C-alpha cells in the first residue's frame, strides 16, 4: 500500500492523533540523495515528521519547513511539507558514516549532536511564524516533542522511525503524533504517560504487519478511537523550468547584466530532488549595435 496518514480523535475527543507509514517517501529520498544508512534514518524521521505535521495544517495553502542546524557530521537537514502531506527534503552531508550506538542502532543523535530545531509555518500572514528550540537529544522525535511543549504549549508525544534492510534500502518507516486537548482528564494523562512510556518501536510494529490504525488502537486500548481522515502522503518536489526562469528574472537588471557579460549558461541544481536546470541568456542587438558590428 502507498504511504498514507490517518487523522482522528481518541478517548472521547480528549486526544487527537496523526499516524502514518512513510516507507516509499523515505526510500525515494534515499535513492535521490544516495544517503548513507544513518543519513537515511535522520532524513527519514524528519520527512515523516513533516508529513504528519502537514496533516495539522488548517488551510490548503499552508506550508511548513522543518530545519535542523547542528554541529554533528551530518551538517543539518531541511524538510518542507504542505497541507496535503506532500513532502521533500535534503541532508547537508548525505555520505556521513558512523558506528552503531551502544544499542546497536543507527546513531542519529551522534550524527546531529548539538543544534537548533526550527519550525517555520507560512499560513498566509505577512511574516511566517518561526519557532525555535534547542535539540534535546538529537533523536528528532524527542526534539519535536520538546518543541511542541515549549514553543506551542501542546503536550505531545512524537514517535518516528526508519528501519533499514541489509542492502541499505528502506524496509519500514513511519510515525505518530499524539496531542492532549486542553480538557483532557488527569486520569487519562497519567494512563497515557504510562502507555507511551512502555511503547518501544513503531517500525518494529509496522514490520510485524500492523497498520497505523492498529498501532493507534493498541496505544488506546480500552478507549474509543475515531479516524476522521485518511490522507495520501508522498514525496513531491515542485521545482520546474518555469520556476527557475522566474527566479532568474527576479535577480534584477544589474545581476542579469553581469550574467550576460559572462556569456555562460546558468546552471542550477535543486537541493531537494537533484534536478538540474540550465538557462542561456542572450540579447538581440539594437540597430546601433548591428551597425557597429559591421
Residue ranges of each PLM-predicted region?
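Short metal-coordination and nucleic-acid-contact micro-motifs, chiefly zinc-binding Cys/His arrays
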Residues: 230-235, 264-266
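Interaction interfaces in information-processing and related assembly proteins
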Residues: 1-229
Amino acid at each position: 500500500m502507498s504511504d498514507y496518514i490517518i487523522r482522528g480523535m481518541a478517548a472521547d475527543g480528549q486526544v487527537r492523533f496523526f499516524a502514518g507509514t512513510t516507507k516509499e517517501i523515505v526510500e525515494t529520498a534515499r535513492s535521490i540523495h544516495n544517503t548513507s544508512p544513518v543519513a537515511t534514518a535522520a532524513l527519514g524521521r524528519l520527512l515523516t515528521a513533516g508529513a504528519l505535521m502537514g496533516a495539522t495544517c488548517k488551510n490548503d495553502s499552508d506550508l511548513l519547513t522543518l530545519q535542523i542546524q547542528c554541529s554533528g557530521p551530518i551538517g543539518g537537514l531541511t524538510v518542507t511539507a504542505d497541507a496535503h502531506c506532500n513532502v521533500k527534503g535534503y541532508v547537508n552531508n548525505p555520505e556521513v558514516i558512523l558506528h552503531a550506538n551502544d544499542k546497536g542502532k543507527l546513531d542519529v543523535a551522534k550524527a546531529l549532536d548539538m543544534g537548533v530545531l526550527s519550525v517555520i509555518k507560512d499560513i498566509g500572514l505577512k511574516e511566517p511564524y518561526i519557532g525555535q528550540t534547542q535539540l534535546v537529544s538529537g533523536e528528532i522525535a524527542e526534539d519535536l516533542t520538546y518543541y511542541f511543549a515549549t514553543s506551542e504549549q501542546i503536550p505531545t508525544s512524537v514517535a518516528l522511525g526508519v528501519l533499514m534492510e541489509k542492502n541499505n534500502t528502506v524496509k519500514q518507516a513511519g510515525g505518530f503524533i499524539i496531542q492532549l486537548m486542553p480538557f483532557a482528564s488527569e486520569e487519562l494523562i497519567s494512563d497515557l504517560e504510562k502507555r507511551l512510556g512502555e511503547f518501544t518501536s513503531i517500525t518494529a510494529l509496522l514490520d510485524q504487519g500492523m497498520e497505523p490504525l492498529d498501532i493507534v488502537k493498541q496505544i488506546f486500548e480500552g478507549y474509543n478511537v475515531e479516524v476522521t481522515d485518511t490522507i495520501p502522503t508522498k514525496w513531491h518536489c515542485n521545482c520546474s523550468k518555469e520556476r527557475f526562469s522566474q527566479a532568474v528574472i527576479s535577480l534584477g537588471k544589474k545581476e542579469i547584466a553581469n550574467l550576460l557579460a559572462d556569456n555562460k549558461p546558468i546552471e542550477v541544481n535543486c537541493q531537494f530532488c537533484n534536478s538540474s536546470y540550465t538557462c542561456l541568456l542572450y540579447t538581440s542587438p539594437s540597430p546601433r549595435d548591428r551597425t557597429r558590428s559591421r
